[in-house]
């Protein structure tokens, strides 16, 4: 099975060393809203009383970032891109124990410089 994240170049910079942007396809984006569940909330509450990292939420947000990134890559491929430049994550609290993670960047077609 091919890992979708291996099929496209994703960078936080406006250019990719060794590559030339030949076409801009538009904004690639992918988002997910994750809700906590009772088990995580109880563990988080106990950790909050004690202090320190809330590992249950850290794990949940890491999973959400991976899924948002995967969705952005799928969108970039649908746009006909083989790379995404200026990649970023954005997060927001939706309320009710939910958080949105949004991945976005500029979908482009690149070719190796000669």
Swiss-Prot record:
<dbReference type="Pfam" id="PF01906">
    <property type="entry name" value="YbjQ_1"/>
</dbReference>
<protein>
    <recommendedName>
        <fullName>UPF0145 protein PF1756</fullName>
    </recommendedName>
</protein>
<comment type="similarity">
    <text>Belongs to the UPF0145 family.</text>
</comment>
<dbReference type="InterPro" id="IPR002765">
    <property type="entry name" value="UPF0145_YbjQ-like"/>
</dbReference>
<dbReference type="InterPro" id="IPR035439">
    <property type="entry name" value="UPF0145_dom_sf"/>
</dbReference>
């Amino acid at each position: 099975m091919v890992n979708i994240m291996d099929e496209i170049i994703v960078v936080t910079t406006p250019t990719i060393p060794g590559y030339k942007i030949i076409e801009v396809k538009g904004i690639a984006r992918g988002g997910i809203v994750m809700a906590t569940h009772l088990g995580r909330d109880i563990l988080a509450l106990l950790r909050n009383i004690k202090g320190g990292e809330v590992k249950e939420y850290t794990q949940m947000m890491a999973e959400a970032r991976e899924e948002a990134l995967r969705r952005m890559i799928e969108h970039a491929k649908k746009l006909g891109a083989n790379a995404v430049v200026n990649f970023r994550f954005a997060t927001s609290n939706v309320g009710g124990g939910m958080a949105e993670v949004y991945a976005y960047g500029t979908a482009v077609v690149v070719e190796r410089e000669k």
